[in-house]
């Protein structure tokens, strides 16, 4: 069944109606609680602006971090309310609670075109409860904020893979629609990448833990033409080939699984040929470029080397579809950012050459911004890390399937 979208809701009319919007405002903050990457906030603006311009009374729901079901000032959405006020050019009020007295009072007091941000939904343990009855109770209280004739817009793509109250259960209780962002993500990832990628199709996976991405690797190895593996997860694959990776990040319990994958997909999996080894895990650590089997004793690799970037770039240059998720090294340390930068630049070059490229959210999107790369050089930068991977894996996304019902 087709999913109704924001366009459908606007055609029905939203003037004077309370519209609950699930956004993704899970943005990184520094120690002074300043937002260091507002990408997700920027991505949420088209939906919010459209509702405001059409006279809706907008109630935003979102989470930040993992407060574990308790009110914790450290995870308050106050910095987000401030950033939204600035970006929208109008005051966005922050409720002092999620479904308490203050939230109700403020929701009841909204005028057409006003925006209210509820406090972090994960301050309530029922948001992430595994018990449907508990989530349902919380969802009922969220829906109660909308008065009569309310509607729900799902626009937090980064959370659609979660069966949580504000994502899944609220949608079951109100007329529901996909926001601009979710609609675009499903179109790009679902149609252009997952269903019918133009070939050759290359996937680049990085990031720390191989265990987090084993399911993805297995699923994509059958679908992609080339599977490039870098970042912290590549060392378990190198160890599976009998290489001593010294103190590099290693998940020994996954070595046999990596061996199986290397045997099954020998023609598809592409691994590093050189590395940037460091004496310790520090931004100013003594470091040198070495072959994969020449990491000095007691040292660790913190990035892929220049020959590896060249090798990966050759694969990307001939690809027509490219999906990238996960950095190639510890890009936050300048001395170990060249691998991630080199691969990102190779993807930009492939895109300029006609390839369709997607950056799969999370750390990769953060790396693009931190390294000052041209975001327009990629066809699409996704806002969902885990969600984009699960969509490509072919998994059921609760927050999407509920919109189809």
UniProtKB/Swiss-Prot annotation:
Substrate binds at residues 24-26, 40, 63-66, 122, 162. GO terms for cellular component: cytosol. ATP binds at residues 213, 332, 361-364. It comes from Corynebacterium diphtheriae (strain ATCC 700971 / NCTC 13129 / Biotype gravis). It is found in: Cytoplasm. Pathway: Carbohydrate degradation; glycolysis; pyruvate from D-glyceraldehyde 3-phosphate: step 2/5. GO terms for biological process: gluconeogenesis; glycolytic process. It catalyses: (2R)-3-phosphoglycerate + ATP = (2R)-3-phospho-glyceroyl phosphate + ADP. This is Phosphoglycerate kinase. The keyword Repressor does not apply. Keywords: ATP-binding, Cytoplasm, Glycolysis, Kinase, Nucleotide-binding, Transferase. It holds the Pfam family PGK. InterPro entries: Phosphoglycerate_kinase, Phosphoglycerate_kinase_CS, Phosphoglycerate_kinase_N, Phosphoglycerate_kinase_sf. Belongs to the phosphoglycerate kinase family. Its EC number is 2.7.2.3. GO terms for molecular function: ADP binding; ATP binding; phosphoglycerate kinase activity. HAMAP family: Phosphoglyc_kinase. Monomer. The keyword Cytoplasm applies.
